[in-house]
Amino acid sequence: MYTLYGIKNCDSVKKARQWLDKHKVEYQFHDFRVHGLTPEQLQIFIERAGWESVLNKRSTSWRQVDEGQKADLNAEKAAVLMLANLTLIKRPVLVAGEQLFIGFNAENYQTLL
């Protein structure tokens, strides 16, 4: 079974859930706001996709991050920031076995069928 990580009211997460439901793909939904995220879970995302892909620099949350924290960012500092503010993680994150998908893209999800 796959796990879809995100926030219930996020538009991209809604699209991903609708796509998975429509194509009858079994998955478990993990809401960051309800269940949180462990450092180990985030580390898996970072190892498979790279911290630059996981960190959402387009989010309103990113714009609120102090400039000092943005300077000299690396994987370790980014992980600390993302764990402190889960809305900095690009959504949704779909873990499908060894595959990991960041953001919703129907063409990429098609490979699951």
Place the predicted regions along the sequence by residue.
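Alpha-helix C-terminal capping segments
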Residues: 20, 112-113
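Thiol/selenol-based redox catalytic cores and closely related redox-interacting motifs
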Residues: 32-112
